[in-house]
Amino acid sequence: MSLDFKRYLCSRINWDSSVIGIMGERGVGKTTMLLQRIKEKYANPDDTFYISLDHYWFGTHELQDLIKFMYKRGITEFYIDEVHKYKGWSTILKNLVDELQDLRIVYTGSSLLEIDNAKVDMSRRQTIYTLRGMSFREYLEYEGILKINPLAFEELLTDHVAVSMEFVPKTKILVAFDNYLHTGVYPFYKTAGKDFLVRLKEVVDTVMESDLPATEKITYDTIEKCKKLLMIIAENVPLQPNTDKLAASLGTTRDTLLKLLYKLDKAEILELLTVELKSYKKLVNPGKIYLGNTNLMYALSPGIELGTLRETFFIDQCASVGTVQMPSKGDFIVNEKYLFEVGGEDKTFDQIAGIPDSYLAIDGIETGYGARIPLWMFGLLY
């Protein structure tokens, strides 16, 4: 297990917390983070214990019994993978933390988990983090091309020219950007090689066939509808849905359709663009529906439209660090303030002329000027 490259979240976690939860999309590297932490902290790996709850061993054995058994033998820190595969996991962990002095737990789970419910049990003792797919900045480091510190959003808006001038001469940044759009979001692209897109399709299938049923009371028929829904969207991105017609085509109700859409959004397979701030507690009609990232477009969409590819990258990167909404003019509004149009080198301000805090995110350029910012630079935010 190499420590040469670590995900952005590693340095943000307060590892002193007694209970740490790391949520995230399947395939983004949660397990690798756990194993790196073990290697980094323990000279002797036998001083801690790693558990994967998707192992068949737990079909006939209890998690709490295993932890108590190892605790009595001097193990006080446990790394638990895929908690969503174990029924009643949050109550079990709460009871163990209450019962066993100085017990420490780091766990991972699907982004589909309703952690708000779990927080009722351990709200004062656990800290929850979300691991996103790799940013373009991380990809550059992972590939050994460049090492760049993350930029705050406002810093990007004001300092993008100086930042790009520092790094652009060192590499063919647009070539790297194109490679990232194809295969750079999920760290396993390195081991998957030419099979990456096939593997990514399998990841999506696993989310629908395994993770969804593990986190929701859901029938086989609903899973099949979910798959059909995803294919309809993948073939028509960005989809501007008529929810009544879309529900009818799936043979379901509008309410069920919205629940499925928001579940796929939470799983980061989709990105729902709404006029008001998105909330999983208030399911409103999305104005547009995108796939969750550009790699998913190449894996699932029969044809790639360049404008949609650009917009998908922009919304994915910006939504990782802030909020993105659908404005009345322009393409996106970020953090309820900054208005953006996304396009190629010929893009102008015509559609958003005279609007304060408006910018262009321009593809195909290495360096921008003023309010024209290179699209690739929005991949430097985390």
Indicate where each model-derived feature is located:
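A cross-kingdom feature that marks ATP-driven nucleic-acid transaction machinery
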Residues: 1-3, 13, 20, 36, ...
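Walker A (P-loop) phosphate-binding loop of P-loop NTPases
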Residues: 26-27
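Short glycine-rich substrate-engagement loop in P-loop NTPases that contacts/grips substrate
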Residues: 45-77
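Conserved P-loop NTPase "ATPase switch" module shared by AAA+ and STAND
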Residues: 71-89
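Structural recognition of the conserved hydrophobic beta-strand(s) that form the central parallel beta-sheet
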Residues: 79, 104-110, 130
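Interdomain motor-coupling "hinge/lid" segment immediately C-terminal to the ATP-binding subdomain
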Residues: 110, 116-224, 230
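Accessory nucleic acid-recognition modules appended to NTPase machines
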Residues: 188-328
